[in-house]
């Protein structure tokens, strides 16, 4: 049966190496590894069975990054916690378990456990003791410590290399605020603690695209979407909006425009929350509040009333030519990313 959430992007991370660090109780045979490889077929994806003891795991990872020289490191849960400490690389920490010792205690991880995925050494089970829990508490105390020795310039550079992604339905770890106290690039995605195809495609892939664009110094044409085109009379996304938005972000830099209502701060917050709820991670930091659309530099403006002084091409949403988002999709498909 065809999976509607898996789509391949051979042009993204082409010829590059992606390193994946798995979560607690998992292995390099995790389905996430094959999911990444399937999505980015021209990239090389590497992963390693991480030792149970955290100091050994970090030693292995520090050895491996020198060996494989990854262009991007992605870590999930425990792997996200380790990934934060691999300074100097572009990396994504997904639901990072920065309070691993407490998480183990809260979720009854003490005692005999079963490896969730096949390990290269053939082990099927392992034992979590109080001593091991203490080891994880100690390793998490090292998180963020490397930032303290950096100069302001080095810190700013390092912070631009790291993304934290947090599932809004994660009931296992809750480290968004802790992460945000050290790194500015933190976003939510719709999903639970464990990634599935949908949360990976909608939450992680857009960030990988941004990172690849930055690495390649790739400038995509800019599309502005005015918020007057987004919602129906009930406040829900208009028909085919999600389809159009997901198509556009694959080829363009897409920004949401909303009026800068100085006397209505609550509306500013409501507009941002709507975008996060319905457009999710791709809209993160891609909302522009402005009352002067003619001052914006861009290629396309989709608006119910496009500003005649906008320097690019205006598409009048709701007109006979662009009555619905389906007509907008057809227009941009014909352009082919131009």
What is each stretch, according to the model?
Residues 5-67:
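Active-site catalytic motif of lipid deacylating hydrolases and related acyltransferases
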Residues 71-75, 91-93, 162-168, 287-289, ...:
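Short, hydrophobic beta-strand segments that form beta-sheet elements in well-ordered domains
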Residues 74-84:
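Gly/Ala-rich beta-loop-alpha elbow adjacent to hydrolase catalytic centers
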Residues 90-211:
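The alpha/beta-hydrolase serine catalytic core
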Residues 185-222, 313-338:
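Charged phosphate-binding loop/patch that engages nucleotide di/tri-phosphates or the phosphate backbone
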Residues 216-235:
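Asp-based phosphoryl-transfer active-site loop
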Residues 231-255:
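Short, acidic loop-to-helix structural element flanking the phosphoryl-transfer center
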Residues 265-338:
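C-terminal cap/substrate-recognition subdomain and adjoining C-terminal extension
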């Amino acid at each position: 049966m065809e999976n509607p959430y898996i789509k391949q992007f051979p042009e993204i991370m082409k010829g590059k190496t992606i390193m994946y660090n798995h979560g607690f109780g998992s292995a390099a045979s995790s389905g996430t590894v094959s999911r990444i490889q399937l999505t980015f077929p021209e990239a090389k994806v590497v992963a390693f069975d991480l030792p149970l003891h955290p100091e050994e795991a970090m030693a292995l990872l520090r050895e491996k990054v020198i060996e494989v020289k990854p262009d991007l490191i992605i870590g999930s849960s425990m792997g996200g916690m380790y990934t934060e400490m691999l300074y100097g690389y572009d990396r994504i920490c997904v639901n990072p378990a920065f309070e691993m010792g407490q998480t183990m205690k809260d979720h009854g991880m003490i005692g005999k456990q079963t490896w969730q995925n096949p390990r290269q050494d053939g082990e099927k089970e392992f034992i979590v003791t109080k001593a091991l829990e203490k080891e994880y508490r100690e390793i998490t105390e090292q998180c963020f410590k490397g930032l303290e020795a950096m100069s302001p310039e080095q810190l700013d550079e390092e912070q631009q290399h790291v993304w934290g992604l947090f599932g809004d339905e994660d009931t296992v770890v809750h480290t968004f605020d802790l992460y945000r106290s050290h790194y500015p690039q933190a976003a939510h995605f719709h999903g639970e603690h464990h990634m599935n195809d949908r949360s990976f495609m909608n939450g992680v892939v857009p960030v990988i695209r941004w990172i690849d664009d930055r690495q390649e110094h790739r400038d995509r044409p800019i599309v502005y979407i005015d918020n007057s085109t987004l919602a129906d009379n009930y406040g829900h996304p208009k028909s085919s909006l999600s389809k159009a938005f997901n198509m556009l972000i694959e080829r363009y830099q897409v920004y949401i425009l909303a009026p800068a209502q100085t006397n209505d701060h609550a509306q500013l917050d409501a507009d941002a929350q709507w975008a996060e709820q319905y457009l999710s991670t791709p809209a993160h930091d891609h909302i522009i509040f402005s009352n002067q659309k003619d001052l914006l530099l861009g290629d396309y403006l989709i608006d119910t009333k496009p500003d005649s002084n906008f320097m690019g091409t205006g598409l009048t949403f709701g007109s006979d030519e662009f009555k619905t988002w389906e007509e907008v999709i057809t227009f941009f498909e014909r352009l082919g990313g131009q």
